[in-house]
Structures are given as structure tokens and as C-alpha cells.
A protein has these predicted regions:
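Long, compositionally biased charged/polar accessory segments in the mid-to-C-terminal portions
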Residues: 144-191
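A short, solvent-exposed beta-strand micro-motif common in secreted/extracellular proteins
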Residues: 230, 238-249
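Short, acidic Ser/Thr/Gly-rich low-complexity loop/linker segments typical of extracellular
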Residues: 217-231
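Iron-sulfur cluster-binding cysteine motifs and their immediate structural context
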Residues: 16-34, 72-99, 106-123, 140-161
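Short, ordered, surface-exposed loop/turn motifs in non-cytosolic proteins
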Residues: 191-193, 200-217
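Structured interaction patches on ligand/partner-binding surfaces of diverse proteins
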Residues: 249-271
Length: 271
């Protein structure tokens, strides 16, 4: 069966995937796979923009949010009409049959990922279909994947993605294994701590200062040196409490930092 993979590190936020999805499904009736997607209010694939940090250290990451086409789909379990939601054996795509859906909304409420929408005008639930109608006509991949210029988003056989899946991350990691999600990510945004060290007396940045970041409880320690601009940065940090220590010769400074959010410490005087 097929899986979707997305490498956040090479996604440039072009929105081609989101636009291609709209182009394929708005005003187009692909019954029995899907009725038309509304112009507004629904994004069967929504590109999430994650902005974090504080000026001047701001990072932006993009990743698609779509149906996970779960092997143990909560929506299928919640559906009250036999066969209205089914999983295709040949590719693993989960489909809401628009000819059988009665509009009870049970699947909308059951989806823990918030990716099933309700079409008030048509009185039916709708979501990503993986462009199953195109695959059935000979396409190798959905429109969103076909439109991705950086190959960040792929639709491949599960066996081909074994190495990717082994290191994969998930938007809801606590549910991924239980639901058997078939959308796998790598390099999802994590916390960072950054700053610029300077000497207030010399009025110059401090180059080559030793910067150590110690997790509370001594679980892990990270180290770095300030660069030619006096900058340092620690990336891919877990959420937690840390002690940041900066040393240069006899001068030192200690700062308590929490990664409940990304932290840009700005200019740090070393005295």
C-alpha cells in the first residue's frame, strides 16, 4: 500500500500542493470518490505555516495537514452507515462515499486530526481522497504530490519509504501507532535558543565564546561557540528547562531558559 511522506526541511512554502488540491476538486464532481469541494471553508490539504522565534531570529516552516488515511481510522469506526467510509486495499486510501454518506457528522466529530469537513450545502462529510479518481485513471500520484517542485511531498509504496518511516515524526505522536497513520513527516519544527554575545566595554561582539546549554536534571548538555558575528544557536531542542552558560576567559554569564516556546535572547552583554 501507499504512504505520503513529507520532509519539512525542503518545503519552501510555495503552496502549490494546496492550490493543486483546490484546482482538482473545486467545481469538479468525482463521484463516487468525491463531490465538489466548496470554494471556501475547506482545505482537504492545508499547508500549515509555523512561525516561531522573535525578531531578529525568526524561523518559518511549512508542512501539509491532510487526512492520514489511517489503517485503524476512527472515522470508519464512528460511521453509522455500512460502507459509507471504506479503505481501498490497493493503495490504502480512506474514502467517504458521497453516495452513501447521510450527513450524520459522526466521522467529523471522531477525527482526532480535524481533517474531515462538513459540506452544509450537500449535507455530507468531505476530506482528502488522495485523488483516488486520478490514480484509477492511470496517474502515479495525487495532484498535490505532482505539483511539489522540491519533492518534499511524495506518494510512494510503503516498502520504498522504510528508511524514511523509521525516522518519521507525527503531528499527533501519541496517536500515530494506534491509528496507523499513513502520512509520515521528517524535520517537524522543534525548539531553538539563539542569541548574540557582546562586550559592553569594548562595544564589540565576542567571537569564540564557549556556550553551554544544560538540560534540567543533567539529562543532556549541548555546546557551541559564538561565530564571527558573536552569534550562537541551539536547534532541535525538546520542551523543557535549561541553564545557558556563556564563558570567555574570566568572564561568564548564566541564564535560565525555558523552551516552552522558541527563544531569541537578543544581545547578551558579557561582563
Amino acid at each position: 500500500m501507499k504512504v505520503f511522506t513529507h520532509d519539512v526541511s525542503i518545503c519552501n512554502g510555495c503552496y502549490n500542493c494546496q492550490i493543486a488540491c483546490k484546482d482538482e476538486h473545486v467545481a469538479n464532481d468525482w463521484t463516487p470518490i468525491a463531490k465538489p469541494q466548496p470554494d471556501t471553508g475547506q482545505f482537504w490539504l492545508k499547508l500549515s505555516e509555523n512561525v516561531r522565534g522573535q525578531v531578529p531570529r525568526v524561523k518559518i516552516a511549512y508542512y501539509p495537514v491532510m487526512c492520514n488515511h489511517c489503517d485503524n481510522a476512527p472515522c470508519m469506526e464512528a460511521c453509522k452507515v455500512k460502507g459509507a467510509i471504506y479503505k481501498r486495499k490497493k493503495d490504502g486510501l480512506v474514502i467517504i462515499d458521497p453516495t452513501k454518506c447521510t450527513g450524520c457528522r459522526s466521522c467529523v466529530d471522531a477525527c482526532p486530526y480535524g481533517v474531515i469537513y462538513f459540506n452544509e450545502d450537500l449535507n455530507l462529510a468531505q476530506k482528502c481522497t488522495g485523488c483516488a479518481h486520478l490514480l484509477d485513471s492511470g496517474w502515479k500520484e495525487p495532484r498535490c504530490v505532482d505539483a511539489c517542485p522540491t519533492l518534499a511531498l511524495k506518494f510512494v509504496e510503503e516498502s520504498e519509504a522504510k528508511d524514511f518511516i523509521a525516522k518519521a515524526e507525527y503531528l499527533k505522536p501519541e496517536r500515530a501507532a494506534k491509528d496507523g497513520v499513513r502520512v509520515h513527516y521528517q524535520n517537524l519544527p522543534k525548539r531553538f535558543i539563539a542569541g548574540t554575545v557582546y562586550d559592553p566595554v569594548e562595544k564589540e561582539v565576542v567571537i569564540g565564546a564557549s556556550v553551554t546549554l544544560a538540560a534540567k536534571g543533567g539529562k543532556k548538555t549541548y555546546s557551541a561557540k559564538t561565530d564571527g558575528f558573536g552569534d550562537f544557536e541551539f536547534e532541535k531542542l525538546p520542551v523543557g528547562q535549561f541553564t545557558l552558560t556563556i564563558k570567555d576567559g574570566k568572564k561568564s554569564k548564566e541564564i535560565k531558559v525555558s523552551t516552552d516556546k522558541d527563544v531569541s535572547l537578543g544581545d547578551i552583554p558579557l561582563t
